Amino acid sequence: MRILVIGSGGREHAILKGLAADPATTDLHVAPGSPAFASLATVHADYKEVADPARMLELAQDIKPELVVIGPEIPLVAGVADTLRAEGIAVFGPNADAAQIEGSKAFAKEVMEAAGVATARAQTLPPGMTDDDIEHELDYFGPMYVVKDDGLAAGKGVVVTADRAEARQHIHLVHAAGNPVLLESFLDGPEVSLFCLVDGETVVPLLPAQDHKRAYDNDEGPNTGGMGAYTPLPWLSAEGVDRIVREVCEPVAKQMVERGTPYSGLLYAGLAWGQEGPSVIEFNCRFGDPETQPLLSLLKTPLAGVLNAVATGTLDELPALEWEDAYAVTVVLAAANYPESPRKGDAITSPDLADTDKILHAGTAVKDAEVISNGGRVLNVIGKGETLSAARAAAYEVLENIELADSFYRTDIGQAAEEGRISIDS
């Protein structure tokens, strides 16, 4: 099978690694990719305009792929999948209308309300609101204050704070950009990321994972795109996963069909598990980053066949997914000054830099035959083991041998679960 992957981050490196290991994959391409991906696929670095449907179609018509896998959310919201499907190309990823479940938080709230899915109460604050009206809404919702940019913000458009001034500042910042704000009630409880393959009303869950959004240890610092993740969750039972599928993912998939925007692709439910069970924090319309990296490292079922089943509408015929009986942890190595203004161009050295079992490249480039940093989240380090403790130890051992000036990483990815400090009633 000839396959084209769209994207250039650590998530796409993980997807390429999985596809390359599948005997059904005969020819693998990526755009725009990264020099680090060249050992797995043909890299089309000139095709950087991933959100331009015409440009992506041009590449697809040249390559003639049997399957296109779209990694990031921006091309999905921009309608790249629609354009490719219109030309008869099988695509893993939702059409633009369905991708609004991530592209507009207000739209996602409408879907959840219609589907009867538990979520935080919310109010949309449009640009142009008076200061008095904003203060009235802050009185009603906080503290804690949960302030979200209604559009795409790469996981960094959310402020959760007890500081009213900080909440007010973020509202004004989002409004100044011309975007609405979604003000929400705070959802307490441990967070769960559950990815589901969705083909119309057919829903197949992957292993549950937990992301770590804050930049620094102990969940301190600003929100980021994600500083690490682990899977599976020792504190969430199979019955708990079934409950999320039954109460959240299946009703949303059914509601999308009823709205005339059937979902095809990966539906990512970000949830908080409170006293009454799971409530939705957000939906994403694609594989999450960095949760995808540990998840796919445990998947035994060949990946190309899985993604193709979704893309061709045959997910209901796919045999049950098989997983390694193990734990996996991903820790993100971030550049200096991430997430505000990450520094680029610093040399990276490690004896494991080309070992995709240990390191995936999220934001690197090559200059004068030297690997350098080229993004905020630079490397994703993978550790696997029979226990969560062993997986954590494996990841941090690799990190100790990486040199990147002024870089940093969290030392507590998965630690609360390892120490038994997370528990729920499922």
Curated annotation (Swiss-Prot):
Entry note: cofactor: Binds 1 Mg(2+) or Mn(2+) ion per subunit.
InterPro entries assigned to the protein according to its UniProt record, in alphabetical order: ATP-grasp (IPR011761), ATP_grasp_subdomain_1 (IPR013815), PreATP-grasp_dom_sf (IPR016185), PRibGlycinamid_synth_ATP-grasp (IPR020561), PRibGlycinamide_synth (IPR000115), PRibGlycinamide_synth_C-dom (IPR020560), PRibGlycinamide_synth_C_sf (IPR037123), PRibGlycinamide_synth_CS (IPR020559)
Pfam families: GARS_A, GARS_C, GARS_N
Domain annotation ATP-grasp: ranges: 109-312
Amino acids binding Mg(2+): 282, 284
Co-factor requirement: Mg(2+); Mn(2+)
PROSITE patterns membership: ATP_GRASP, GARS
Keywords: ATP-binding, Ligase, Magnesium, Manganese, Metal-binding, Nucleotide-binding, Purine biosynthesis
Keyword Aminoacyl-tRNA synthetase carried by entry: no
SUPFAM superfamilies the record matches: Glutathione synthetase ATP-binding domain-like, PreATP-grasp domain, Rudiment single hybrid motif
Ion transport listed as a keyword: no
Protein name: Phosphoribosylamine--glycine ligase
Gene label: purD
